[in-house]
Amino acid sequence: MIAKTFSSQGALGKAIPGFQARQAQIDMAEAVAKAITQQSQLVVEAGTGTGKTFAYLVPALLSGKKIIISTGSKNLQEQLFHRDLPLMVDALGFFGNVALLKGRANYLCLDRLSRQMVESHTNEADPQLLTQLVKVRSWSSETKSGDLGECDELPEDSLIIPTITSTNDNCLGKECPSYVDCFVSKARRKAMDADVVVVNHHLFLADLAIKETGFGELIPEAEVFIFDEAHQLPDIASQYFGQSVSSRQVQELAKDIEIGYRTEAKDMRQLQKVGDKLTQSAMELRIVLGEPGFRGNWREALSSPSVARELSRLRESLDFAIDVLKLALGRSQLLDTAFERANLIKGRIDRVCDVSITGYSYWYDTTPRHFSLHITPLSVADKFHEQIELKQGSWIFTSATLAVNDDFSHFTHRLGLKPQAQFSLPSPFDYEQQAKLCVPRYLPEPNSAGLADKLVQILAPVIEQNQGRCFFLCTSHNMMRELGERFREVLTVPVLLQGETSKQKTLAEFMELGNALLVATGAFWEGIDVRGDALSCVIIDKLPFTAPDDPLLKARIEDCRLRGGDPFSQVQLPDAVITLKQGVGRLIRDKNDKGALIICDNRLVTRDYGGVFLASLPPIPRTRDLDKVKDFLSQISVTTQNN
């Protein structure tokens, strides 16, 4: 049945102009069909161009079973639901119901919107935010889904989004005056009735973690579970099987208390004081936690007198909030929920401050305005395995980056998987002709002083000659900022820096300019798809080993050591290989793409483990001569102009 569907005279060939199946795609589709029939686990590494999406959609839709498809990113989730699934549904004549389900932070909350509208009249509102609020209110009367991603007038990084969406903590549930029209409830009900539901890993794992306590109903009772971008699952699972609390939760609580005071309990002036104290104490703790963009060891931070002092003040503010809110119980649903939230947040802070429990990593991270405190299990293998055992069905995991030197054990061990089959699909790209890999000669040591200056000196001529069209992927924010600054001093082509505007705007500007250098870090290493001449060179500053002082890594290393393992080969090296494969994957996106990859790290050729990295990368011809890279890029440029 599968082979027939993928044949030139089959359903796909008839429905999709120019469709040509590849043998690797058929092999994967048959393996997925077998896993569905046998209710087994399957792991497949399938890179760009292999056609993996159709390879799992076809057997899934033909099976007639209830299916959940989970993606790592919202981008892929949207693409699957709006582009790939409709194509397959039409081609196969599928008559089942299909639903898209996102986390509640993506849906407009009508009750919170109406409260914000009232609040905006009583307060000195920012004119720009007020304009956005009015546009959202207008859109709210037209939308069927309530998905804010569909509101074109609203920037994706708008500051009003947290104020007009709900969280698990602040949702009023059935007590909400807008419950009948609630977009989250509608989306969930639709998902419960659907045959195919497209979710993302965060939503799936949040529900799985809730199921662990017996309350997870969000994900319908499916029989087939397919995870695309599955390499992200272990880290995301760690978040959901752990515990966290953030200053954002405290400040949102403070804001809701102030709204309750202004609109429903004007005689309780203490509520204003509660809001002010909560906001102030959260800000003071943020300040003593240090520079933004930092991930630190929470156990160590707690021994700092200034951190202990501000944490104590935050706890006092929460106690004060609980005492005052207790007096307001019964006055309004908003304040009743705020009382519950204050108790929840206090409980979470108590939990993350009990650092005596073994088997967990205690850490914190900071942004310019906020902090988060986390307790994360060092391994989710037992918990994830237990959930799979509880829910008999077919579990299929696929991604472009799962194997390290053709070995899947790093991925399968982290999730406690026991797949009946695991394999990699061969790439359809002709890397011999399409790409060149260079580790330049005379590179400084990766962490040496003046590294940025030296890299700019070596690489500026290549970037200039190529007229930009280049990603420079960095392993740290500091290196990214330093390189961005230096390149702006010496290059004539535009230099874009990640973080100066939103990711989407940065990418759109890069495409529009057509001759830019984009210097970026984490967010651009994966999930970015730039095809054609817009991108013909990817440079990586060094091998992406996680910083040795990262508290999560340190905890995993210690855990590995206690189990008698080798932390470098079992933790640090596999993590870095997977990340490098993701970065390298930005270059060649289809069979017509051509480009050069430059990795500025001698360890690829001077250390034994360099061979593990190289063996895990596509078979790209290698050189150490940057002049050969320039020649290759010149040929690409000439070919493009002639075409």
For the regions a language model picked out, list residue spans one by one:
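Signature of the SF2 helicase/ATPase Hel1-core->accessory helical subdomain module
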Residues: L62, E78, R83-P86, S166-E316, ...
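A contiguous, basic/glycine-rich beta-loop/short-helix subdomain that forms a polymer-engagement track
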Residues: P162-V197, L208-F215, F320-L443, G450-Q457, ...
